[in-house]
């Protein structure tokens, strides 16, 4: 059996047998809003107690507070829900959308291509079995979150994300959890409490977006903006030579489990329409696409044969399926193409290269630019956010921050203001490949020219010498630009520049980028960002191994690495690990020093460095006698348990 067929069969088995799989020692809980159907998911990590004294027979313990963390996994980790990928997810937002009474059900699909696919009986086996009804705005209504925010309306979606951003952090009582460095936020406004009104105001000003198409009611609202937690996007999608619908659905579920805040379906292979339907109906997070990829497939891959009519039909098709945001490369103008002639790597964006070829073939202006207002009209009818693509992003550090890149960026700023005229939500895409010392200039230029619309970057990669490790080279740049103010980071996997990522690559890319985003939140001084770090550090110092595993971004890998060398159960309570062993564990020695100081009723926070020499000598003699009396052994050996064969 071929590797490709084997992968598809394994993915099919995953879909057929998928069941709820909670994280270790965690439970799904929901924070309630002002109405019963605003139920915001969080993951609550239960911690073990801390030994604080007593004896072996009568130990005294102190409880540790559970830690609540942001959760993107949807009902896939909720034991109260029965998973059935063939039926899709609950329609969380359906009632909210209906209550606004500004949309109606369409009698049929608006897209000619979508109607053709529906009529094709040969696709019945591939097609998702429970196609939803299609909604569109009534008449001239605009049904975007930006429109409501500008009208002073706080929607359930806005309240949902306000609760989600706070995630119960204000409920913590342990002062050791709440300590936090001030951070440097570079002008961001980070309130101690995110309120629904704050969310509304940020959206109204264009500084944040909630991507939530009215035809994707299954999605759990989330917010992208400089003044909120840094978010992470994961890319999935098939190609002409790899992957299947089953594999892409498996990647979707896998990505949300490991923290993807949004997912982009970048499919360029067969059955793009059907693949996307399966993804949308089973996605608890917003889904983005690059409509140009599918439009190109419709003209058999010949860029110069693209037309506005084909593109418009594709936009309608995807908007009515429920795509939450479109990447549109409307800022790449004909006159910018010659600016790339002296680049080391030319135009590396797929969408950008397609547009550049079309412009040169016809010697006409980019049709996405000339028809941009029509694009905005479509988006306003379905609440599709625009992610304005950087078709001229640098593909090597040699090309970073050049004339072509920043010329396009300025045009994206002009397009942002046009989109806002139609109440369409906007974010701006950024590079790319940028060395560390040039990264901040990218953020500064974006804020200056794009009116503080959220920035969304691919990395950036900080060096070009690491094929196979580009998740690391880009994670460095992602952490930096997130600190400077980037709102969402698009992950890079180890397969970047080498091939289509598989399931494990998706996980590796996501964990790397969740780390980068969290590091950025810490550096910005985002309120509550350090709580999880403090909890894990406390568990580490107290040798609560199980808590260390469970608080980690990847509990599975943390446990596996520990158990490679200390697989016995006693290793989970030992006061050392295999790095230093029992004799050289700095934390164990530090604990012994602290315990001794406490037993001597010394103040461990204030040490008298001018203690009389006579007192020091007496104390040293006491400890010498104690050491000799105990057998003169520096460390007492632990009783080892046999390893079961």
Curated annotation (Swiss-Prot):
GO terms for cellular component: cytosol
Record GO biological process: thiamine biosynthetic process; thiamine diphosphate biosynthetic process
Cofactor(s) the protein needs: [4Fe-4S] cluster
Top-level taxon of the source organism: Bacteria
Record-linked InterPro entries: ThiC, ThiC-associated_dom, ThiC/Bza_core_dom, ThiC/BzaA/B
A molecular-function term among this protein's GO annotations: 4 iron, 4 sulfur cluster binding
Binding site for substrate: 235, 264, 293, 329, 349-351, 390-393, 429, 456
Reactions catalysed according to its record: 5-amino-1-(5-phospho-beta-D-ribosyl)imidazole + S-adenosyl-L-methionine = 4-amino-2-methyl-5-(phosphooxymethyl)pyrimidine + CO + 5'-deoxyadenosine + formate + L-methionine + 3 H(+)
Cofactor-binding details, from the entry: Binds 1 [4Fe-4S] cluster per subunit. The cluster is coordinated with 3 cysteines and an exchangeable S-adenosyl-L-methionine.
Sequence positions that bind Zn(2+): 433, 497
EC number: 4.1.99.17
Pfam families, alphabetized: ThiC-associated, ThiC_Rad_SAM
Binding site for [4Fe-4S] cluster: 577, 580, 585
Keyword field: 4Fe-4S, Iron, Iron-sulfur, Lyase, Metal-binding, S-adenosyl-L-methionine, Thiamine biosynthesis, Zinc
Disulfide bridge map: none
Pathway(s) it belongs to: Cofactor biosynthesis; thiamine diphosphate biosynthesis
Keyword 4Fe-4S: yes
NCBIfam families: PRK09284.1, PRK13352.1, thiC
Role played: Catalyzes the synthesis of the hydroxymethylpyrimidine phosphate (HMP-P) moiety of thiamine from aminoimidazole ribotide (AIR) in a radical S-adenosyl-L-methionine (SAM)-dependent reaction.
HAMAP family per UniProt: ThiC (MF_00089)
Quaternary state and interactors: Homodimer.
Similarity-based family: Belongs to the ThiC family.
Protein name per its UniProtKB record: Phosphomethylpyrimidine synthase
Gene name per UniProt: thiC
């Amino acid at each position: 059996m071929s590797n490709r067929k084997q992968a598809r069969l394994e993915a099919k088995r995953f879909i057929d047998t998928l069941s709820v799989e909670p994280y270790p020692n965690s439970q799904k809980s929901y924070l309630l809003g002002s109405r019963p159907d605003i139920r915001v998911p969080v993951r609550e990590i239960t911690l073990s107690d801390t030994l604080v004294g007593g004896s072996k027979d009568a130990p005294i313990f102190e409880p540790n507070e559970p830690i609540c963390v942001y959760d993107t996994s949807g009902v896939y980790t909720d034991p109260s829900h029965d998973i059935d990928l063939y039926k899709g997810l609950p329609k969380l937002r359906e009632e909210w959308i209906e209550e606004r009474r500004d949309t109606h059900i369409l009698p049929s699909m608006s897209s000619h291509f979508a109607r053709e696919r529906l009529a094709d009986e040969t696709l019945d086996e591939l097609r998702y079995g429970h196609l939803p009804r299609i909604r569109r705005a009534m008449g001239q209504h605009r049904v975007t979150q930006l429109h409501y925010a500008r009208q002073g309306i706080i929607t359930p979606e806005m309240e949902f994300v306000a609760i989600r951003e706070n995630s119960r952090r204000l409920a913590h009582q342990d002062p050791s959890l709440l300590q936090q460095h001030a951070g440097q936020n570079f002008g961001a406004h980070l309130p101690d409490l995110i309120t629904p009104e704050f969310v509304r105001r940020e959206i109204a000003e264009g500084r944040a977006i909630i991507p939530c198409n009215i035809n994707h009611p299954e999605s759990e609202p989330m917010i992208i903006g400089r003044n909120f937690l840094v978010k992470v996007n994961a890319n999935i999608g098939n190609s002409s030579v790899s992957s299947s619908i089953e594999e892409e659905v498996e990647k979707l579920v896998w990505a949300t489990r490991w923290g993807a805040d949004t997912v982009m379906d970048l499919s360029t292979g067969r059955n793009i329409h059907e693949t996307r339907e399966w993804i949308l109906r089973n996605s608890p997070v917003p889904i983005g696409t690059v409509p140009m990829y599918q439009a190109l497939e419709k003209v058999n891959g010949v860029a110069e044969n693209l037309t506005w009519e084909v593109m418009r039909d594709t936009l309608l098709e995807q908007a009515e399926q429920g795509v939450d945001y479109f990447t549109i490369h409307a800022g790449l103008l004909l006159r910018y193409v010659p600016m790339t002639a002296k680049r080391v790597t030319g135009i590396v964006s797929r969408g950008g290269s397609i547009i550049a070829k079309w412009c040169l073939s016809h010697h006409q202006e980019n049709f996405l630019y000339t028809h941009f207002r029509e694009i905005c009209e479509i988006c306003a009818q379905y609440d599709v956010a625009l992610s304005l693509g950087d078709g001229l992003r640098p593909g090597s550090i040699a090309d970073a921050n050049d004339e072509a890149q920043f010329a396009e960026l300025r045009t994206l700023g002009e397009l942002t203001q046009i989109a806002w005229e139609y109440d369409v939500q906007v974010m701006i895409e950024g590079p790319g490949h940028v060395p560390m010392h040039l990264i901040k200039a990218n953020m500064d230029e974006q804020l200056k020219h794009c009116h503080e619309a959220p920035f969304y970057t691919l990395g950036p990669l900080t060096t070009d010498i690491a094929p196979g490790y580009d998740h690391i080279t880009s994670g460095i740049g992602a952490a930096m630009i997130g600190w400077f103010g980037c709102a969402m980071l698009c992950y890079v996997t180890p397969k970047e520049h080498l091939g289509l990522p598989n399931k494990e690559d998706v996980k590796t890319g996501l964990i790397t980028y969740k780390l980068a985003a969290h590091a950025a939140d810490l550096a910005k001084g985002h309120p509550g960002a350090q709580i999880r770090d403090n909890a894990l550090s406390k568990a580490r110092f107290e040798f609560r191994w199980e808590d260390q595993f469970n608080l980690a971004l990847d509990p599975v890998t943390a446990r596996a690495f520990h158990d490679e060398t200390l697989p016995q159960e006693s290793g989970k309570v030992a006061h050392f690990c295999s790095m230093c062993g029992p004799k050289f564990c700095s934390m164990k020695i530090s604990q012994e020093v602290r315990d001794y100081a406490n037993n001597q009723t010394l103040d461990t926070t204030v040490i008298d460095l001018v203690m009389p020499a006579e007192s020091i000598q007496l104390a040293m003699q006491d400890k010498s006698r104690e050491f000799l009396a105990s057998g003169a052994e520096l460390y007492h050996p632990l009783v080892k348990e046999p390893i079961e064969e």
